[in-house]
């Protein structure tokens, strides 16, 4: 699907939940998506790979208000869309990702999909992301 900000590609991932040490819900995605887009990152920067295997965070640093739905979709295959545009901030490089199914899961858990940083594409309420890497300095050097 073509947008004003690049092309959207459809992919799938597997939903995983953990409760310890904190509540986390992620969509495990194909590592090759990250590997492919990392190739395009500037070679003049020392960009570290992401800390964990390729994923999209759905719940992170939040406590769900409605735990009756926690782990309801464990292991379920979920569709998502991602853009072929690499974004970066001071530390991170990422791809934007979108999924109405992931938004629904957040709603069931009593979490907001309100996104205040950027405007999501029409039809979506939240922008998720796929981390490609970071430029954090190694504290042990």
What are the roles of these predicted feature ranges?
Residues 1-141:
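Histidine-dependent nucleotide/RNA phosphoesterase domain, centered on the 2H-phosphoesterase fold
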């Amino acid at each position: 699907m073509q947008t004003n900000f690049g092309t959207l590609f459809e992919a799938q991932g597997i939903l995983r939940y953990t409760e310890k040490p904190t509540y986390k819900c992620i969509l495990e995605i194909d590592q090759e998506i990250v590997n492919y887009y990392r190739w395009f990152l500037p070679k003049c920067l020392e960009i570290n790979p992401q800390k964990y295997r390729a994923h999209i965070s759905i719940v992170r640093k939040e406590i769900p208000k409605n735990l009756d739905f926690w782990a309801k979709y464990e292991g379920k295959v979920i569709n998502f869309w991602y853009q072929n545009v690499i974004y970066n901030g001071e530390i991170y490089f990422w791809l934007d990702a979108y999924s109405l199914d992931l938004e629904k899961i957040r709603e069931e858990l009593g979490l907001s999909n309100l996104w205040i940083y950027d405007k999501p594409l029409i039809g979506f309420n939240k922008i998720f992301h796929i981390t490609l890497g970071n430029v954090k300095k190694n504290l042990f050097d």
